[in-house]
Swiss-Prot record:
It comes from Mus musculus. May play a role in organizing the actin cytoskeleton of the brain cells. It is found in: Cytoplasm, Cytoskeleton. One of its GO terms (cellular component) is dendrite. Highly expressed in brain. Kelch repeats lie at residues 463-509, 510-556, 558-603, 604-650, 652-703, 704-750. Residues 25-36, 74-90 have a biased composition (Low complexity). Residues 170-184 have a biased composition (Polar residues). PANTHER family: KELCH PROTEIN (PTHR24412), KELCH-LIKE PROTEIN 28 (PTHR24412:SF441). This is Kelch-like protein 1. Signal peptide: none annotated.
Length: 751
């Protein structure tokens, strides 16, 4: 290697070395300090040849590792510059009976100095698989990009080293001396891996491209010709790889015409194939993504999709969603669709919405996930779209109107539609309007009129709130809310203090927290929580302290039913008038009840189950506010305390709870669910819960019942399940953030 002053071995040089070593031996006594002959050690052992044996190299190649290579010291015109080696200083001295399998060289000081440089070894770092001799000092002179190191040998058993600039490691083990005859068959071998080889190679190919050298294909798109190298294009594009390696005509053509691709986008992607660099711009990103999809460049497709995700806005999300669908970019389409659903109120105010084709609009109208406050909003959006181009779009009106939940519109809107000019002469539209009017006029038949148009959209059903309850910390003070669209629970606020066995009602989208106990005493206090402002207001207290009471709203006022005052079970009932903000007593129940379930149905207040001090109850009675009287109903099939009660489609449901007979104080937790039909005054067993739940919170959200939390005998539950009356099945839903038993669950339409 000329850069280091050494000369590479050739065949003549090897023969000359053999001649010096074996054909013309010189006496040890005649060799001066600068003699040119190597001598054997005093032990009489033979030298190992310089460098690893051929068999060792082959063995290492089979293992996938590479041994070090060696170079002979440079020779001058006077071969006497080489130094003789003694047994004590020779680098070939055995280490525990073995020698390093690396080439060594003796470096002699300046003539006449008599000093000897330490033995050093040149090696190339390649394998990461084996152990090598340790205790060596490394230095790393660079030689025109070669990843070489110089190694100073010291006695040791193993070594690990990392080659400078390439991240590889030479590994080796100690080896015994090999026969001298190996020198005759061995050859000089080198193993090398360039640093940044691929980068440098592609940079050179880029230069060839710029100079239009060695180009073997020309891509023609429009009026533009783009030269390139087939190998480079095939290495990054599966499209070109298939083209150039298949038996198609393009595989042999020097000029290939590209159809359906933007010229600038193709140019950018060809440059990307050579450089790995790409500039993304808002005005060209769609052409670039379309070209990348065609040419099958997955890396480019991914970065373009992420770039478009960042550009999503109510004014362009519909276009991006349609474009992603056309290109088969599934992830981008999902993100754009979710963005559209979430921001639909802003989307319908933009030009893109008005320009939607009818096929795309019906997908929006049919979705349960559009984030609208009510069905009326969707209806007005449809009317706005139709009026934008009335002559062409009237023919699509009946098809699109079928995706509007007309039965859920206010009756006054339906009355106006019947004589509207757009619908008056359309028979299909008239049928849809009549169906919706029947739904309002015949509420008792609604269970027979169920259809996709009677199912409310997720965002219109309101938000489910879970307030307080017993947890592992002896009383939860957090308020969580559940969003049906996202199927997630999040914390919505905090209570003013700890309350257990209290009641909650909703008036004007505000939570009224009533009674309960704080762990020491039974409460009669009342507080009002505003979810919008997250503020609490103290209201006048009840006349009676109550925990384990039932609370509900009936025709405006709030009713607080039964409970326990700390001394006895109660049958008294109080009513809160929102106008006068006063509590007054109404008629008392027939039976004292605590841990009672209450619900309003068909203008009556139902009081279900509970405990009377001796056992759990199966009885139920109802209160008529117009007569101020309580009347008994048919009893439940099961006795239940801590029962959850809610109404759905004209039926009353009793869910979970516990049964503790008077003769046995051990409670039996229940997973039974019963349904009461007020028309026939009968109870019917329906599908049970997935697990027993005592002190379970139950309410109606949309068209389903939700059972939240509870106690299973060992754990305060954070699970929730929903009941579909149409299929008579319970389904697991998202879990609360903490387990709660006795939590009050209510729905607020507009949180």
């Amino acid at each position: 290697m000329s850069g280091s002053g050494r000369k590479d071995f050739d065949v003549k040089h090897i023969l000359r070395l053999r001649w010096k070593l074996f054909s013309h031996p010189s006496p040890a006594s005649s060799s001066p300090a600068g003699g040119s002959c190597l001598q054997q050690d005093s032990g009489g052992g033979s030298f190992e040849h310089w460098g690893p044996s051929q068999s060792r190299l082959l063995k290492n190649q089979e293992k996938g590792s590479v041994s070090a290579f060696w170079k002979k010291p440079s020779s001058s015109s006077s071969s006497s510059s080489s130094s003789s080696s003694s047994a004590s200083s020779s680098p070939f001295n055995p280490l525990n009976g073995t020698l390093l399998p690396v080439a060594t060289r003796l470096q002699q000081g300046a003539p006449g100095q008599g000093t000897q440089q330490p033995a050093r070894t040149l090696f190339y770092v390649e394998s990461l698989e084996e152990e090598v001799v340790t205790g060596m000092d490394f230095s790393g002179p660079e030689d025109k990009g070669l990843a070489l190191k110089e190694l100073q040998a010291e006695p040791a058993s193993s070594i690990q080293a990392t080659g400078e600039g390439c991240g590889h490691r030479l590994t080796s083990t100690n080896h015994s001396l090999t026969p001298q005859s190996d020198l005759d068959s061995s050859s000089s071998e080198e193993f090398y891996q360039a640093v940044h080889h691929a980068e440098q190679s592609f940079r050179k190919m880029e230069n060839y491209l710029k100079q239009q050298q060695l180009c073997d294909v020309i891509l023609i798109v429009g009026n533009r010709k783009i030269p390139a190298h087939r190998l480079v294009l095939s290495s990054v594009s599966d499209y070109f790889a298939a083209m150039f390696t298949s038996d198609v005509c393009e595989a042999k053509q020097e000029e290939i015409k590209m159809e359906g691709i933007d010229p600038n986008a193709l140019w950018d992607l060809v440059q990307f194939a050579y450089t790995g660099c790409l500039e993304l711009k808002e005005d060209t990103i769609e052409n670039l993504l379309a070209a990348a999809c065609l040419l099958q460049l997955p890396q480019v497709v991914e970065v373009c999709c992420h770039f478009l995700m960042k550009l999503l806005h109510p004014s362009n999300c519909l276009g991006i969603r349609a474009f992603a669908d056309a290109q088969g970019c599934i992830e981008l389409m999902k993100v754009a669709h979710s963005y559209t659903m979430e921001n639909i109120m802003e989307v319908i105010r933009n030009q893109e919405f008005l320009l939607l084709p009818a096929e795309e609009l019906h997908k929006l109208l049919a979705s349960d996930d559009v984030n609208v406050p009510d069905e009326e909003t969707i209806f007005h959006a449809l009317m706005m779209w139709v009026k934008y181009d009335m002559q062409r779009r009237c023919s699509d009106l009946s098809m699109l109107l079928a995706f509007i939940r007309l039965p859920l519109l206010p009756p006054q809107i339906l009355a106006d539609l019947e004589n509207h000019a757009l619908f008056k002469n359309d028979l299909e539209c008239q049928k849809l309007i009549l169906e919706a009017m029947k739904y309002h006029l015949l509420p008792e038949r609604r269970t027979l009129m169920q259809s996709p148009r009677t199912k409310p959209r997720k965002s219109t059903v309101g938000t489910l709130y879970a307030v307080g309850g017993m947890d592992n910390n002896k009383g939860a003070t957090t308020i969580e809310k559940y969003d049906l669209r996202t199927n997630l629970w999040i914390q919505a606020g905090m209570m003013n203090g700890r309350r257990l066995q209290f009641g909650v009602a909703v008036i004007d989208d505000k939570l009224f927290v009533i009674g309960g106990r704080d762990g020491l005493k039974t409460l009669n206090t009342v507080e009002c929580y505003n979810p919008k402002t997250k503020t609490w207001t103290v209201l006048p207290p009840m006349s009676t302290h109550r925990h384990g009471l039932g609370v509900t709203v009936l025709e405006g006022p709030i009713y607080a039913v039964g409970g326990h005052d700390g001394w006895s079970y109660l049958n008294t009932v109080e009513r809160w008038d929102p106008q006068s903000q006063q509590w007054t007593y109404v008629a008392s129940m027939s039976i004292a009840r605590s841990t009672v379930g209450v619900a309003a149905l068909n203008g009556k207040l139902y009081s279900v189950g509970g405990r009377d001090g001796s056992s759990c109850l199966s009885s139920m009675e109802y209160y008529d506010p117009h007569t101020n009287k309580w009347s008994m109903c048919a009893p439940m099939c099961k006795r239940r305390g801590g029962v959850g009660v809610a109404t759905c489609d004209g039926f009353l449901y009793a869910v979970g709870g516990h049964d503790a007979p008077a003769s046995n104080h051990c409670s039996r937790l229940l997973d039974y669910v019963e349904r009461y039909d007020p028309k026939t005054d009968t109870w019917t067993m329906v599908a049970p819960l997935s697990m027993p739940r005592d002190a379970v919170g139950v309410c109606l959200l949309g068209d389903r019942l939700y059972a939240v939390g509870g106690y299973d005998g060992q754990t305060y539950l954070n699970t929730m399940e929903s009941y579909d009356p149409q299929t008579n099945e319970w389904t697991q839903m998202a879990s609360l953030n903490i387990g709660r038993a006795g939590a009050c669950v209510v729905v607020i339409k507009q949180p």
